[in-house]
A protein has these predicted regions:
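Predominantly flavin-linked oxidoreductase catalytic cores and closely associated redox partners
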Residues: 21-174
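Flavin (FAD/FMN) cofactor-binding and adjacent substrate-gating region
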Residues: 1-33
Length: 179
């Protein structure tokens, strides 16, 4: 409160911009709450229709190496082998490209970052006229925290917790009690 007006805006449920504030201008820092599914579909449509991107839906089943050890292509379950100039590993903790192909070990930070597991839910509003929170609500729990993000059509609620200090069953109970 002593260094920023953001705290006051948040607790009063106010937006960080006024109707007269120009696009992408701001008086205080802010971020947008986005429906990840709708945003992904928007990006897919924009890239395919406007940028000429070819969108393929497939699971990567293997990596084909070039002679120098780089990735020449990836093998997929339904699209065959796909060649590209750039591959981004989106396989999560499986680390198919970075870990399995290149041998890059996961760099654990569990000694300082305890929260390693998350549960998430999409919760509809009780009624269409329910207020949408202007900020992410964060609520401390026994071994983590719950986030509550208001979106136009629903709330995104999740529980991030330490699996060393809480069981999935207990974390689920805490999340359901919050909801």
């Amino acid at each position: 409160e002593a260094v920023s007006s953001q705290n006051t805006l948040m607790f009063k449920g106010l937006a960080p911009k006024q109707i007269s504030t120009p696009e992408f201008a701001f008086n205080v820092n802010y971020g947008y709450h986005l429906d990840a599914g709708k945003f992904a579909e928007f990006l897919r449509r924009h890239c395919v229709e406007k940028l000429g991107v070819k969108h393929l839906r497939a699971n990567v089943t293997g990596v084909i190496s070039a002679e120098n050890g780089d990735i020449a292509s990836v093998a997929t379950d339904v699209c065959g082998d796909i060649q590209a100039d750039l591959f981004i590993d989106c396989s999560g903790s499986r680390a198919l490209l970075l870990g399995e192909h290149y041998g890059v070990a996961i760099s654990s930070k569990s000694d300082v970052l305890f929260n390693d597991t998350a549960l998430a839910a999409q919760v509809p509003y009780t009624k269409e006229s329910d207020a949408i929170e202007s900020s992410t609500l964060s609520t401390a729990q026994t071994a983590g925290w719950i986030w509550d993000i208001g979106l136009p059509s629903r709330r995104g609620i999740g529980h991030v917790y330490s699996s060393r200090h809480n069981s999935e069953g207990r974390a689920t109970e805490e999340l359901l009690a919050y909801i």
